[in-house]
Swiss-Prot record:
It is found in: Cell membrane. Belongs to the G-protein coupled receptor 1 family. Endothelin receptor subfamily. EDNRB sub-subfamily. Keywords: Cell membrane, Disulfide bond, G-protein coupled receptor, Lipoprotein, Membrane, Palmitate, Receptor, Transducer, Transmembrane, Transmembrane helix. Its main location: membrane. The chain crosses the membrane at residues 8-32, 44-69, 82-103, 125-149, 178-202, 231-256, 269-295. Non-specific receptor for endothelin 1, 2, and 3. Mediates its action by association with G proteins that activate a phosphatidylinositol-calcium second messenger system. PANTHER family: ENDOTHELIN RECEPTOR TYPE B, G_PROTEIN_RECEP_F1_2 DOMAIN-CONTAINING PROTEIN. The lineage of its organism: Eukaryota, Metazoa, Chordata, Craniata, Vertebrata. It comes from Coturnix japonica (Japanese quail). This is Endothelin receptor type B. Disulfide bonds join 80-161.
Length: 347
């Protein structure tokens, strides 16, 4: 009964995520690609994050919806391995991009001079390549572990794609047993811990700045604080979306006992939590553009301009957006002049 109920709920949520995710993430990528003033380090990382979400939405969600509604798996063993592989790679891209964004915000405050110059795009490109390579490598065990089995159900032989109960190597058996703890520690706790660490360091660094420098760089600091607030919002959204799923899996590992006479009620509770967690985690693929629209004024202006004038020329940029870009560049130039005149003034 629980499975039958959530089958339709999950289908509706998946269709909603599919539509909103394609519109939101493709619009976000177009904004960063078309507008030169939006092509900075943090925004390129956000674009990488959006691209990872878009791949997951286009490939995984339609197949997952079919899997919910149909009993049999008709796509073959290749797709059985590809779907969980892309899903884990997409989550890995999200996690590592959020870590890189948090570190980037601290470095922006601690070392102003590294923001400008040709080194920034090169370092950002290296970061993105590393993020994608590491995410793909860490997702390989999923492709190995998942396989198809045939089982009898209601007088029919059904082909099912799942994490195979028996693995061929000792490493894969260990991965199967430790999978939930590994996912919880790396794909959930790591970005939260890194964000907490570097945002604490960033706060200490900003409090340590001299009051005169704070006044001179008032507009520049406002720009940095807005980006920091945006990154923090993305991490918070990630945590809220993925917490229910990880919580249900960890509780099942720690509380569930096969000898417990009430285990059926407990399993039903965990099944409900699992379905809710899957829906919440799925929302994370489409909610980042919405969060950026609500938190960042610059992204809000760009979204409005892009959605209203999707087919128009890239020259039709809103006046407020252009002023924002010019103001940001002027602040950078003003800070360089201030910094060069005070380079040797501190003891």
């Amino acid at each position: 009964e629980i499975k039958e109920t959530f089958k339709y709920i999950n289908t509706v949520v998946s269709c909603l995520v599919f539509v909103l995710g394609i519109i939101g993430n493709s619009t976000l990528l177009r904004i960063i690609y078309k507008n030169k003033c939006m092509r900075n380090g943090p925004n390129i990382l956000i674009a990488s994050l959006a691209l990872g979400d878009l791949l997951h939405i286009i490939i995984d969600i339609p197949i997952s919806v079919y899997k919910l509604l149909a009993e049999d798996w008709p796509f073959g063993v290749e797709m059985c391995k590809l779907v969980p592989f892309i899903q884990k790679a997409s989550v890995g891209i999200t996690v590592l991009s959020l870590c890189a964004l948090s570190i980037d915000r601290y470095r922006a405050v601690a070392s102003w001079s590294r923001i400008k110059g040709i080194g920034v795009p090169k370092w950002t490109a290296v970061e993105i390549v590393l993020i994608w390579v590491i995410s793909v490598v860490l997702a390989v065990p999923e492709a190995i572990a998942f396989d198809m089995i045939t089982m009898e159900y209601r007088g029919k032989d059904l082909r099912i794609c799942l994490l195979h109960p028996t693995q061929k190597t000792s490493f894969m058996m260990f991965y199967k047993q430790a999978k939930d703890w590994w996912l919880f520690s790396f794909y959930f706790c790591l970005p939260l811990a890194i964000t907490a660490l570097f945002y604490t360091l960033m706060t200490c660094e900003m409090l340590r700045k001299k009051s005169g420098m704070q006044i001179a760089l008032n507009d520049h600091l406002k720009q940095r604080r807005e980006v920091a607030k945006t990154v923090f919002c993305l991490v918070l959204v990630f945590a809220l979306c993925w917490l229910p799923l990880h919580l249900s899996r960890i509780l099942k590992l720690t509380i569930y006992d096969q000898k417990d006479p009430n285990r059926c009620e407990l399993l039903s509770f965990f099944l409900v939590m699992d379905y809710i967690g899957i829906n919440m985690a799925s929302l994370n693929s489409c909610i980042n553009p919405i969060a950026l629209y609500l938190v960042s004024k610059r992204f809000q202006n760009c979204f409005k301009s892009c959605l209203c004038c999707w087919c128009q020329s890239k020259d039709l940029l809103s006046l407020e957006e252009r002023q924002s870009c010019l103001k940001f560049k002027a602040n950078d130039h003003g800070y360089d002049n201030f910094r060069s005149s005070n380079k040797y003034s501190s003891s």
